[in-house]
Amino acid sequence: MNALFVANKPAGISSNHFLSRLKRKYGVKKAGFSGTLDPFASGCLIVALGNHTRLFNYIDKTPKIYEATMWLGATSASLDNENIEEITLCPPLNLADVKAALGELKGEIAYVPPKFSAKHVDGKRAYELARAGEEFELKNQTMSVFDVNLTAYMHPFLSFRISVSEGSYVRSYAQNLAAKLGVKATLSALKRVSEGKFVYENERFLNPLDYISLPRNEYLRDPADVMLGKKLSVEKLKFGAEGLYLINFDEFFSIIEIKDETVTYKLNKVEKC
C-alpha cells in the first residue's frame, strides 16, 4: 500500500509509538512521518505508507502553524510539561507588554534548541545525553517566524498561535518570549495545526502531486523508457534548463534533476494513490 495522509497525533505518546499504531491499523510494514511531534504535543503529523515515504524531501511543509500555551512561573528541563523542576508565583503580565514582546519576536529569530530534542551531539541524540544527566551545549540557530498572535491569557497560562519555518522549536520560542517578559515559563500544551497545505482530514488519502511544487517537465519519447529507468538525455525533454523537475505519467510520476547537461533520476516510478 502506498499512501500519503495527515494523522492527528494525541498528546502523551511519542511520534514513533503513534506510527507503530498506524502501521498496525493499515497492515503495512513500511511507513514514516515528517516532522517529529514531541510526546506532550498533539496535532498534524504527515504520514506516508509504502514507497510514498520517499516523497518527504519534495513535499511542501512550510509554514508550520502551532497553537501553544505557556505556563508562567513553571520551569522544566525539557521546556514542556514534563520534567517540571519548580513552580513559582509570578505577578500577572500587562497585555500590552505581551503583545509588544510578540511583535518584537518576528522575522529571523536566534534561539538555542532544547536539550531534550533530536539534535545530534557527537553521534548521539541530545535527549539521550540530557536524560543521562550529561553536560553539553547546543549551538545557536535561527528560525523564521512569519506571524504570531496572542490568543488567550488567563494567568498563569498564556496562549499564542505561531507560524514558523520548518525545523523550528516552539519550546525555544517560548523561552525567548519568557526572557523578554522577564519571567520563567515552560510550555504546558502544544498543537500543530498545519504544515504547508497539510491539515488533518480524518486520514483521507492525498494526491502527492497537489503537495509538490516542483516545475513540471515532459518526456517527449516513449514513457516506457522512464518506466524501465533508462538513461535520459536533455534533448528528449521539453525543458532543458538545470534544476529539479516532476514528470507526470498516467500511472506514475518521476522526479529528475538536470545538471551539467546530464539527467539523473531522484525518484522514479512513484505510483499514484
Task: Give, region by region, the residue ranges found by the protein language model.
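Long, charge-dense, solvent-exposed interaction surfaces that engage phosphate-rich ligands
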Residues: 107-129
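Accessory RNA 3′-end/elbow-binding domains used by RNA modification enzymes
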Residues: 1-12, 16-33, 37, 41-44, ...
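Helix-hairpin-helix/helix-loop-helix acidic hairpins
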Residues: 142-158
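Acidic, low-complexity central loop/insert segments
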Residues: 58-113
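Pseudouridine synthase
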Residues: 125, 130, 156-197
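Short, charged/polar surface micro-motifs in flexible loops or helix N-caps
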Residues: 50-53, 74-75
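Short aromatic-glycine motifs in intrinsically disordered, low-complexity regions
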Residues: 130-139
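Phosphate-centric recognition/catalysis
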Residues: 47
